[in-house]
């Protein structure tokens, strides 16, 4: 064993691995800070709306558009066959409107794997990442990069 290796023992099994050279990236720099637009969203309602919209996204381009306005979040998508899906959720939001796109798969993945009633979403502008957090768990953060739609 050397300083460039890691050793793991599980009963009669021993695993030795070479450590990666270099410095671990500063992941804290990609977590958005001070996002002015805050939403509290019903996880199940949002998940179901996204799943319905995802049916009409193309396999290659999985984009959904969120249009946030006073009291509503409109979710829409379309595909190459000119089919379109639109959903609207009531949200407790008052403020500046926002039009932003996301890969629906990333949103569905996080919402599918949570066991909570409500999620919080922090948004900046159309080019800024979204930050999903949980009201009762300060250790949970999920960052979703926007995409152009």
Language model segments and positions:
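DNA polymerase processivity clamps
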Residues: 1-20, 35-149
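Short hinge/gating elements
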Residues: 30-34
């Amino acid at each position: 064993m050397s300083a460039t290796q890691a050793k793991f023992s599980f009963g009669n099994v021993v695993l030795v691995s070479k450590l990666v050279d270099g410095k671990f990236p500063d992941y804290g720099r990609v977590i958005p800070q001070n996002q002015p637009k805050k939403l509290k969203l019903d996880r199940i309602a949002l998940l179901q709306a996204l799943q319905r919209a995802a049916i009409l996204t193309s396999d290659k381009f999985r984009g959904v558009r969120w249009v946030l306005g006073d009291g509503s979040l409109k979710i829409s998508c379309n595909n190459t066959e000119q089919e379109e899906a639109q959903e609207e959720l009531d949200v407790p939001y008052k403020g500046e409107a926002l039009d932003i796109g996301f890969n629906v798969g990333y949103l569905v993945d996080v919402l599918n794997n949570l066991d909570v009633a409500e999620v919080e979403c922090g948004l900046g502008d159309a080019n800024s990442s979204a930050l999903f957090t949980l009201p009762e768990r300060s250790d949970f953060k999920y960052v979703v990069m926007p995409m152009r739609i």
